[in-house]
Amino acid sequence: MDLQGKKVLVFGAGISGIGSCGLLEKEGAEVILYDGNDKKDAEAMKAQLGGGSKVRVVLGAFPEEEMESLDLVVMSPGVPTDLPVVLAMKEKGIPVWGEIELAYVCGKGDVLGITGTNGKTTTTSLLGEIMKNARDSVFVVGNIGTPYTNAAADTREDSVIVAELSSFQLESIHTFHPKVSAVLNITPDHLNRHHTMEAYIRAKMNIAKNQTPEDICVLNYEDEETRKMADEFQASVLFFSSKHKLEQGIYLDGEDIVYKPEKEKEGTVICKTGELQILGVHNYENVMAAVAMAAAYGVDLDVIRKSVLAFKGVEHRIEYVAEKNGVVYYNDSKGTNPDAAIKGIQAMNRPTILIGGGYDKQSDFHEWIQSFDGKVRYLVLIGATKEQIQREAAECGFHDCILKDTFEEALDTCVELARPGDAVLLSPACASWGMFPNYEVRGEEFKKYVNAL
């Protein structure tokens, strides 16, 4: 679609919506920024758009008579696609794109796209580092913090775009076509948005829906859901495995990470797990996925190896903060669902005071609680899910729960309970919304508190 002169509605005034407006204006579109919350500050939104912007801001109910004149609707990922106003626009035949689709249509270069329930940011960050060491024009975008729409206008034919993609972003793509994709794992998450596990999985699978046999999709052999996807995708599949020696793919053999792209040939040892600067089997899986994607794209294995060994990990992922009075503090604020938080507990090698709870995404916490396995001395709970988690903990035979009203009260309690030799771990198994704007702010508050002790 040529966007010059087209009337485009951007739905949602968050960071992605602002990025979409900027890109659309560069493309010559007439842009309306719409948010259903009529209590938002229209002037503040205009200020974010910049002084020269001609974007019109509409808050509250969208005028039905104006719908008829729209050529396109661009959804921000935080806005559900099944809202009545969105369904009404679809019924009128108005195309509805996500911001990823918009950026892809307007941008140039090859996309390497990563999705999955957990591990996306670590894998995207590592793949971004590898590509920056191998290519001149590299953009790391998407759910990782920089909207793809902010970068699209600067991309060139030889650019590589490394994109972290959430299920929200993938549910509204149409022509988006990565050269290399990856689905890292699938566990229940965001069911409050997608309603069913099947719908969540389908959204994730969209990452490969436009790929052809000339493209590559990297999948986790140890995850039942991702393994099944190999039969449905058109792309050539490359598996990674932490438990099986694969005939073809990338796998863990003792301490060796082995890349074996062809069945008939010997594999190449990329590195040993003991040489890595990040902890845990889940991180070895993230490394394997990034290595497989880079190698499939044609990056030299020596460049990959050097990049992997230099990689220090990602903020808010089992991040060492400090040792205070013999107690080690870890920030795993990115543990926003039970499966991710299990990885945090598994990485602990000390008795642990655990901070859990937050926004209710309709998760089940039994498996998370069962993973405590004698490591967790106390579970300090906050947020909307604290009573539910306490109930489920009791059902699992864990009774050392302490409920607090504020984050600071929870931290004070952890300091009181912790003994020399313990760890205090922020790995909440819940999203931060309701108490914090995002998991990054939650992690920063934790680090600020710890460093002030």
Regions found by a protein language model. Give the residues of each.
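Residues in the short beta-alpha loop(s) of Rossmann-like NAD(P)-binding domains
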Residues: 14, 37, 144, 222-223, ...
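Nucleotide phosphate-binding/pyrophosphate-handling subdomain across enzymes
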Residues: 2-7, 17-27, 137, 273-376
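C-terminal helical cap/extension that packs against the catalytic core
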Residues: 43-54, 366-422
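Beta-strand->loop->alpha-helix junctions that form or flank phosphate-binding loops
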Residues: 60-61, 97-101, 234-252, 307-309, ...
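Short internal beta-strands
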Residues: 30-37, 217-221, 355-356, 375-384
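Residues at the starts of beta-strands that form the adenosine-phosphate
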Residues: 7, 29-30, 137, 179-180, ...
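Phosphate-binding loop of NTP-binding sites
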Residues: 22-26, 64-68, 77-221, 225-236, ...
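N-terminal leader/targeting and accessory segments in enzymes
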Residues: 1-98, 102
